[in-house]
Amino acid sequence: MAAAPSAGGVGEGSSSSAAAAAAAAAATIGPHVVDEEAMWQMNLGEAMEAGPYPERIGEPDCSYYMRTGLCRFGMTCKFNHPADRKMAVAAARMKGEYPQRIGQPECQYYLKTGTCKFGATCKFHHPREKAAIATRVQLNALGYPLRPNEKECAYYLRTGQCKFGSTCKFHHPQPSNTMVAVRGSVYSPGQSVTSPSQHTYPGAVTNWPLSRSASFIASPRWPGHSSYAQVIVPPGLVQVPGWNPYAAQIGSSSSDDQQRTAGGAQYYTGSRHSETPNMGDQGMFSSYQAGSVPLGLYTVQRESIFPERPDQPECQFYMKTGDCKFGAVCKFHHPKERIIPTPNCALSSLGLPLRPGEPICTFYSRYGICKFGPNCKFDHPMGTVMYGLATSPTGDVSARRMLAPVPAHSEVSPDNVSGRSRRITHSDSQQIPSGERGTEREAS
């Protein structure tokens, strides 16, 4: 009975001795660790205090101090610590002084533009001798930098503008001619006129001396009345036979066709258009022969706003249509002398291809024009005009029959193609519109 308590006392004493040993170990290790951490935190606190820092005139500014206002090295720092840090940063930016940190990578933005938005707080090296060369970059006519060894600015090539201005690191090629941008479209400025009666065109583009006889030809890209400024042509008005913007691209096989085309000639003037019944009364209009330029020859533009880049590929859209929506900022080549390929089909009086077996050109069916001209791969029917023109001696008989004018119900008219007389059949009468059919019933 007496031995049990002694055993329990022995066990209890051993556990207490173990706890005492652990406490002694903690006492020997804990304070040392605590003191080391406290000393580290104290050193950091002392280093980050806004205490006095050495001003070393002539030495580079302490970059960490310039950014944060603190310095962990304190009085032992070998760099300069201006008393008024904010004022020093502002003065450095105004003077264009940037830190020279030999051994650090060079600031690429500073080398290309001569400026640095971080100023004295930038952690990279800013060599002054290289910056002097970079700041002498040449500017183009629009005020954007010319950097031939760099890539071309894609945004500038598309829009003609660059939001980075003279600080852009890419190349901005010189525009070929002086341009006037009107709502995203580029036009060459109007030519001065020697006529005594001049006035200023009160449109989107001002201060253009123009004659009262100046003509306005709408661009084929914007049919009808458009919100875009129309192209202004010099006083020698260009006659457009039968609303034909492709007159210089088509040839006529007979003089009769030229006379017919000239008889119904139309002009684009300051108003929408005015018809001229004959060519005898021309007035101030200059003479112009339709189809005077044969097919397959060179057509030379009198004034072009499209750039010539011989070392670049040719602009395919320009080679097909003679137009380019990018204007003077297009990065492809636009030769002044453009070979007009000879079309492999007959052309209408508008200079558009007649392809009876192909689908009808959607743009032509809506607006009556086609920007692709003779190179369009779709059909451009003339409505009631037959395909059997002088330029198409071997036309399709079915197409002629469908497009030939339909005579009255009880009349017999000669067939313009075969020379035979025929009476309108039931199938032909089904093609007559309901309005004409009702008119025929009333007439009968």
From Swiss-Prot:
The keyword Metal-binding applies. A zinc finger (C3H1-type) spans 56-84, 101-129, 147-175, 309-337, 355-383. It holds the Pfam family zf-CCCH. Residues 251-276, 405-444 are annotated as: Disordered. The keyword Oxidoreductase does not apply. GO terms for molecular function: DNA binding; mRNA binding; zinc ion binding. Keywords: DNA-binding, Metal-binding, Repeat, Zinc, Zinc-finger. PROSITE patterns: ZF_C3H1. This is Zinc finger CCCH domain-containing protein 63. It comes from Oryza sativa subsp. japonica.
